[in-house]
Swiss-Prot record:
Protein's UniProt keywords contain Manganese: yes
Organism: Xanthomonas euvesicatoria pv. vesicatoria (strain 85-10)
Chain residues that bind Zn(2+): C410, C413, C428, C434
Gene: ligA
Name of the molecule in the record: DNA ligase
One Pfam family per UniProt: DNA_ligase_OB
HAMAP family for the chain: DNA_ligase_A (MF_01588)
Limits of the BRCT domain: 750-833
Length: 833
């Protein structure tokens, strides 16, 4: 009689056979196992693992089915940023891209790796010692969301690498997508079941991967292609991009079979034509092709510009287009007051999506196209994502149409719509008095990346603003549980009579009588159900609501108490979050982070003249002027004062960056003022002769010319200084420069930090400060704060609920610091919270 196989051996054999089948199906595209046989093996493995739970493993194929839902995704900071790519839309742009590389590297015909640009969701997969440990979305490039549980359900993604020789840490970047045939089959199944269909494969992939319940993701037909690597440690990879892709394929990752190595611009353009011709017949959606310099040494030599590499570019296909009719042109007011014209369209299918609205960008664009109500227009999904009106079919224009004009008044608040000189965008002048701007400002202020007020949704923000209880974002910190309960009852009631019936159950008789008087005051006939104005809710909310003493025993209050607690929690924040939350035009997360790192103090930032902001890398004139305009407004300064007075606390204030010592000078101020003809060279020349704007005026034209400054430059400078507002700005900028320099630590204190050259890792939750704040303070002392533990880690800071990083640090003999030791160390070196 044959002995039964050992369960551990059988489980191991089943896992290997199933993963081999996955590899042959998804990577090699050479399926060698029938679906029925695959299902039979999977069922046997599931049964064995249930019978022997001690043999369970995270990398088992059975773990792809998904787990219970999470409440939200955790943030993941990418060790290396997931950069975006520059775009090319013409052959000339591609030729120019190749020319720049050829000249820089002195190579006539450089080699490129060319590949399709999949229309899916970019992700990063982290492997340690060959095992999948974490997966994250791209997010903003610096920080993504942990979607590891969902990625485990994607069969094309290996849970353990094949072969050998992988680095200890390997981060693989790629695209999760939904194949066209799988998308159509899924939608057909949903229609048959009466379920919700997906709009298009791209949205299907992105939405599936961001499901909080991984069991839902497991039911979606997702796949994956690898296109590169991120962090790599303790291991070597080939020195060309194409060879790296070949190595990834050998380790078990699917790589597009359409990847080719081509030479020069002719090779790139020929590849573009081949892929474009085959586009409609591909098994997946693409919106262009990507060209990457194949040689890694050349990539390092080319480097990066802003948030994109100089050695790679995306060559986009022309957007898909359809014709339809303009039914109306309306104005939308954004949170910064921008008045954007939007075309309301007769519904039309464009690139798999029903489009009913399309942006017209601005009034100048409407004038160029001469778009009119009633016109037949060409609608294009720019980048296959954002619908826009691309052209007017003039010969189909009906008679009697009229040229469109920008309205003179805001459609929301009635304030004047104005346009600054030289600007394309019109804006509502109502600023914070405009409900449209207030609502958008509140949405932005409480968002996750800003003040992170959990539980305050868009609909309730509208109720808050409409009620008049909050007129500025600082009013959030005055709200009470009773006010929230009152607003919820009004906003959800079907009629004022229903609201009063509900209120009677929860109010003392005197308070109820007061409420009844308010309802009658807005014109509601309480004797019957008639004569109820459609706007009764908004009217009552605006009527100045009394504060009622609700009977907490009879009404559900937990949601309101949780919201108040979330508002209270948001009082403690960081400078970069606070700056981002203000909603300053052109100031995104990266700019807010840079401002925080360079200046370190809200009081300093809010009083700086705009030219000094240009000293921060990647902040140009437009962003600097936007910052200056924002802080010049008395209403905005009052809003900041209100927030601080109502308990908002910025916990990571620190001295300005020592880099400002070299960046700031009289010459730099001259350069940044945007004075006509005063180039950086002329600014240095002027600063060598005088040391202040007052001295410039005193010196006069002759003295400046004798110092070698050309007469046209001197004339332009003195003419600029003749305007009082320019003189005031110049003097303020120089005074602010001196203030900043005076606040810098002494030069001899900046030579080295106590942690220079040391790598530190933080894990767990800290009580006294956030991990971001701890990271900034450690970096200020010279440390490099990493995301993973290795033999090179100097010490690990372990907070509450420290996880696997603590275990790994202990196994490697890495020194462990508790929060108390960290705080003492920071205090000893001037970085106390």
């Amino acid at each position: 009689m044959t002995a039964s196989p050992d369960p551990a051996q059988r489980i191991d054999a089943l896992r290997r056979r199933i993963e081999d089948a996955n590899y042959r199906y998804h990577v090699l595209d050479e399926p060698q196992m029938a679906d029925a046989d695959y299902d039979k093996l999977m069922r046997e493995l599931e049964a064995l693992e249930r019978a022997h739970p001690e043999l369970a493993s995270a990398d088992s194929p059975t773990q792809r089915v998904g787990h219970l839902a999470a409440s939200r995704f955790a943030e993941v900071r990418h060790a290396l940023p997931m950069l975006s790519l520059g775009n090319a839309f013409s052959e000339e742009e591609v030729t120019e891209f190749v020319r720049r590389i050829s000249e820089r590297l002195e190579v006539k015909q450089p080699l490129f790796s060319a590949e399709p640009k999949l229309d899916g969701l970019a992700i990063s997969l982290r492997y340690e010692n060959g095992e999948f440990v974490q997966g994250a979305t791209r997010g903003d490039g610096a920080t993504g969301e942990d979607v590891s549980a969902n990625l485990r359900t994607v069969k094309a993604i290996p849970l353990r690498l094949r072969g050998e020789g992988w680095p200890q840490v390997l981060e693989v970047r790629g695209e999760v997508y939904m194949p066209r045939a799988a998308f159509e089959a899924y939608n057909a199944q949903m229609r048959a079941q009466g379920g919700k269909v997906l709009a298009n494969p791209r949205n299907g992939a992105a939405g599936s991967l961001r499901q909080l319940d991984a069991r839902i993701t497991a039911q979606r037909p997702l796949s994956f292609f690898a296109y590169g690597v991120g962090e790599v440690s303790e291991g070597a990879l080939p020195q060309t991009h194409s060879a790296i892709l070949a190595q990834l394929r050998a380790w078990g990752f699917p790589v597009s079979a359409l990847v080719e190595v081509v030479q020069g611009s002719d090779g790139l353009l020929a590849y573009y034509q081949r892929i474009g011709a085959a586009r409609d017949g591909l098994a997946f959606d693409i919106d262009g092709v990507v060209y990457k310099l194949d040689d890694l040494a050349g990539q390092r030599e080319m480097g990066f510009v802003s948030r994109a590499p100089r050695w790679a570019i995306a060559h986009k296909f022309p957007a898909q287009e359809q014709s339809t009719t303009v039914e109306a042109i309306e104005i939308q007011i954004g949170r910064t007051g921008a008045a954007t014209p939007v075309a309301r369209l007769k519904p039309v299918h464009v690139a798999g999506v029903i489009v009913t609205n399309a942006t017209l960008h601005n009034a100048d664009q409407i004038a160029r196209l001469d778009v009119r109500v009633g016109d037949t227009v060409i609608v294009r999904r720019a980048g296959d994502v954002i619908p826009e009106v691309a052209a007017v079919v003039a010969d189909q224009r009906p008679p009697g149409t009229q040229a469109w004009q920008m309205p003179t008044q805001c459609p929301v608040c009635g304030s004047q719509i104005v346009r600054e000189e030289g600007q394309a965008v019109w804006r509502c002048s109502g600023e914070l008095t405009c409900p449209a701007q207030r609502k958008e400002a509140f949405r932005h202020f409480v968002s996750r990346r800003a003040m992170d007020v959990d539980g305050l949704g868009e609909k309730f923000i509208e109720v808050l603003v409409d009620s008049g209880l909050v007129k500025g974002v600082a009013d959030l910190y005055l709200l009470s549980v009773d006010q929230l309960l009152q607003l919820r009852l009004i906003s959800t009631a079907e009629s004022p009579h229903a609201f009063l019936r509900e209120a009677r159950e929860h109010l003392a008789s005197g308070a109820y009588a007061q409420l009844e008087t308010s309802v009658v005051g807005i014109g509601v006939d309480l004797a019957g159900e008639r004569d109820v104005p459609q706007t009764w809710q908004a009217d009552l909310l605006r009527a100045g609501l009394p504060r009622f003493d609700w009977n907490r025993k009879k009404i559900a209050t937990k949601w309101a108490e949780n919201l108040i607690e979330a508002i209270e929690t948001s009082r403690d924040t960081t400078l970069e979050r606070f700056l981002f939350a203000l909603g300053i035009e052109h100031v995104g997360e990266s700019t807010a982070k840079a401002l925080s790192a360079w200046f370190g103090d809200l009081e300093l930032i809010r009083h700086l003249p705009w030219p000094l902001f240009k000293r921060v890398p990647d902040i140009g004139g437009e962003v600097a002027r936007s910052l200056g305009h924002f802080f010049d407004q008395a209403g905005n300064q009052q809003a900041i004062d209100d927030l601080l007075q109502r308990g908002v606390r910025i916990g990571d204030t620190h001295p300005p960056s020592p880099k400002l010592r070299e960046a700031l000078s009289f010459a730099s101020v001259l350069e940044d003022m945007d004075i006509p003809k005063v180039t950086p060279v002329r600014a240095q020349q002027l600063a060598a002769s005088v040391d202040s704007f007052a001295a410039l005026r005193t010196a006069g034209a002759d003295a400046l010319q004798q110092a070698g400054v050309p007469a046209p430059v001197v004339a332009a400078l003195l003419q600029w200084l003749d305007r009082p507002e320019n003189t005031a700005l110049a003097n303020a900028a120089q005074q602010a420069m001196e203030t900043v320099l005076a606040r810098l630590p002494q030069a001899d204190a900046l030579q080295t930090g106590p942690l220079d050259g040391q790598t530190v890792v933080i894990t767990g939750t800290l009580a006294a400060l956030t991990r971001d704040a701890a990271k900034q303070r450690l970096e200020a002392l010279g440390a490099k704060v990493a995301g993973s533990v290795s033999k090179k880690t100097a010490f690990l800071v372990a907070g509450e609920e420290a996880g696997s990083k603590l275990d790994k640090a202990q196994s490697l003999g890495v020194e462990i610091w508790g929060e108390a030791r960290l705080l003492a160390f920071l205090g000893d070196h001037g970085q106390q919270p």
